[in-house]
């Protein structure tokens, strides 16, 4: 309760829940927070007071419902916000360099990006999943049943690098990515960023940007590659905010350009690569010769839609 009250007080003091902007308090330190609480005891007490009344009111509602034969079901979303008290207090339990989402489907061509960090299950296992046990125990005080939103995410999640906006740049975790040697043996040498970094030609720039193509070529690129200031979708989104038609054209075009890769390097296993899902729609795929396209199709489909065991049935 006290760390949560400290989080609320710091959030109000700095005017943002983004704790990376809290200066000396950006990283949770128990002793520093305890000292802060002593200096701000009035504000800390207020947030504790609010939580106490929330607890008593919800407990009364639950008791009344049960006395009338009604049970309450609580909703348990798979993730928590990256600017939450949990992420601030327990950063080691989360992959803060990643975000959860969903691959593209008929309803979302670029996939979904939910924004919250994925769980670091290895660190959670070290204390017997104490964070989860405490979370479930607290919910059990009020609810008789839980609905777990996205139960599959406990076993396999669509993980997107934090610098990306589109779900297209994600990959499944856990997964078995291809090694650089495996890809090289199949005709895809990823050295120097080949197949993993966008390499647009004039035709692609013309299709994406129209009359703005020359501006993109001279302002955003050097030697056929995007400059560092435009090298991620997050940077592009920050660089071109708003709904102005020109800015929107540049932003969306650069976003699409950054999606234009065949493989994504695993951030925690250097030298291992995931095929970019649905990469057959990319300009880069179009530049492949027929034989290499066929090879990519097979390695892509075997990775995402393996059929080797589909003939097996459960006993």
Predicted regions and their residues:
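Catalytic cores of glycan-processing enzymes that make or break glycosidic bonds
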Residues: 1-312
């Amino acid at each position: 309760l006290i760390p949560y009250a400290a989080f609320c007080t710091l959030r109000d003091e700095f005017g943002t829940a983004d704790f990376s902007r809290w200066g000396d308090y950006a990283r949770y330190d128990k002793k520093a927070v305890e000292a802060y609480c002593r200096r701000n005891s009035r504000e800390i007490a207020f947030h504790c007071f609010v939580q106490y009344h929330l607890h008593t009111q919800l407990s009364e509602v639950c008791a009344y419902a049960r006395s009338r034969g009604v049970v309450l079901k609580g909703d348990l979303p798979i993730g928590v916000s990256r600017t939450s008290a949990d992420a601030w207090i327990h950063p080691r339990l989360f992959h803060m360099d990643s975000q959860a989402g969903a691959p593209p489907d008929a309803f979302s061509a670029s996939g979904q990006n939910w924004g919250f960090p994925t769980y670091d299950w290895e660190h959670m296992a070290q204390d017997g999943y104490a964070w989860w046990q405490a979370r479930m125990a607290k919910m059990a005080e009020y609810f008789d049943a839980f609905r777990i939103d996205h139960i599959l995410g406990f076993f396999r999640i669509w993980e997107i690098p934090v610098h990306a906006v589109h779900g297209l740049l994600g990959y499944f975790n856990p997964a078995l990515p291809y090694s650089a040697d495996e890809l090289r043996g199949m005709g895809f040498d990823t050295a120097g960023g080949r197949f993993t970094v966008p390499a647009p030609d004039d035709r692609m720039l013309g299709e994406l940007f129209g009359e703005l193509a020359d501006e993109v070529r001279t302002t955003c690129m050097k030697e056929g590659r995007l400059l560092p200031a435009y090298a991620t979708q997050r940077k592009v989104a920050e660089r071109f905010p708003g709904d102005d038609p020109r800015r929107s054209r540049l932003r969306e075009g650069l976003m699409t350009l950054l999606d234009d890769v065949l493989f994504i390097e695993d951030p925690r296993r250097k030298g291992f690569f995931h095929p970019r899902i649905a990469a057959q729609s990319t300009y880069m795929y179009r530049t492949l010769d027929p034989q290499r396209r066929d090879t990519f199709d097979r390695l892509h489909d075997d990775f995402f839609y393996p059929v080797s065991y589909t003939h097996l049935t459960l006993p």
